[in-house]
UniProtKB/Swiss-Prot annotation:
<keyword id="KW-0371">Homeobox</keyword>
<comment type="function">
    <text>Probable transcription factor that may play a regulatory role in auxin/cytokinin signaling during root development.</text>
</comment>
<feature type="compositionally biased region" description="Basic residues">
    <location>
        <begin position="44"/>
        <end position="53"/>
    </location>
</feature>
<dbReference type="GO" id="GO:0003677">
    <property type="term" value="F:DNA binding"/>
</dbReference>
<dbReference type="GO" id="GO:0048364">
    <property type="term" value="P:root development"/>
</dbReference>
<keyword id="KW-0346">Stress response</keyword>
<dbReference type="GO" id="GO:0003700">
    <property type="term" value="F:DNA-binding transcription factor activity"/>
</dbReference>
<comment type="similarity">
    <text>Belongs to the HD-ZIP homeobox family. Class I subfamily.</text>
</comment>
<dbReference type="InterPro" id="IPR017970">
    <property type="entry name" value="Homeobox_CS"/>
</dbReference>
<feature type="region of interest" description="Leucine-zipper">
    <location>
        <begin position="128"/>
        <end position="156"/>
    </location>
</feature>
<dbReference type="Pfam" id="PF00046">
    <property type="entry name" value="Homeodomain"/>
</dbReference>
<feature type="region of interest" description="Disordered">
    <location>
        <begin position="36"/>
        <end position="62"/>
    </location>
</feature>
<dbReference type="GO" id="GO:0009733">
    <property type="term" value="P:response to auxin"/>
</dbReference>
<keyword id="KW-0804">Transcription</keyword>
<dbReference type="InterPro" id="IPR045224">
    <property type="entry name" value="HDZip_class_I_plant"/>
</dbReference>
<keyword id="KW-0805">Transcription regulation</keyword>
<feature type="DNA-binding region" description="Homeobox">
    <location>
        <begin position="68"/>
        <end position="127"/>
    </location>
</feature>
Length: 228
């Protein structure tokens, strides 16, 4: 009995010091309000933290800053023309030049840097497109020239085949012809050939005497002396 009363006194003291205790129920822990007598087990709800006034003001400032940056991104035509002119002179943007351009145009240096970065990217893409167009045009010309060469090769191959066929036909005809007939035909053609040096029998050839020189007369006398 004394031991049980001692345990009750300790529990009563603990409930006064710790008003909320946990009691196991169906293998789950439930927070019990000891001050209310523990008649009903009510789970404790967590309260959401309220934002302080300073934090809300900070968020509003962030939104305003973002809106200001968005407004700064809208450039006028004059600013765009000046930036294009500066980019045409020099594609790279150094820190001193960036500050100078930003001061002249009334822009933020970061905005100028971002504009130059985007402009360089567009410029590089354009250069790549131009280089690709040149290479594609060169490739198309090479392919066209190759097709023309292949067509010429086919024509020349056909002509060569026809020439070889004619050569074979001529060789076969020469092999079929006998040698005697060829020699007789050649002799007949030689006999029938006209002779330009044959003299007509009834023609008188009178050579003037005065055309004969002394050497010719001396030779004639020499030959006449031999036959006397």
């Amino acid at each position: 009995m004394d031991h049980g009363r001692l345990m009750d006194d300790q529990m009563m003291l603990g409930s006064q010091v710790y008003p909320y205790t946990t009691q196991p129920q169906n293998s789950h822990c439930i927070i019990v309000n000891q001050i209310d007598g523990g008649e009903e087990s009510k789970p404790v709800k967590r309260r959401r933290k309220r934002r302080s006034k300073g934090s809300s003001a900070t968020n509003e400032e962030d939104v305003a800053e973002i809106g200001g940056m968005l407004r700064k991104r809208k450039l006028t035509d004059e600013q765009v023309n000046m930036l294009e002119y500066s980019f045409g002179n020099e594609h790279k943007l150094e820190s001193g030049r960036k500050e100078k351009i930003a001061g002249e145009l009334g822009l933020d240096p970061r905005q100028v840097a971002v504009w130059f970065q985007n402009r360089r990217a567009r410029w590089k893409n354009k250069k790549l497109e131009e280089e690709y167009a040149k290479l594609k045009n060169h490739h198309d010309n090479v392919v066209l020239g190759q097709c023309q060469l292949e067509s010429q090769i086919l024509k020349l191959t056909e002509q060569l085949s026809e020439a070889q066929s004619e050569i074979r036909k001529l060789s076969e005809r020469l092999e079929e012809m006998p040698t005697n007939s060829s020699s007789s035909s050649l002799s007949v053609e030689a006999n029938n050939a006209p002779t330009d040096f044959e003299l007509a029998p009834e023609t008188n050839y009178n050579i003037p005497f005065y055309m004969l020189d002394n050497n010719y007369l001396q030779s004639m006398e020499y030959w006449d002396g031999l036959y006397v």
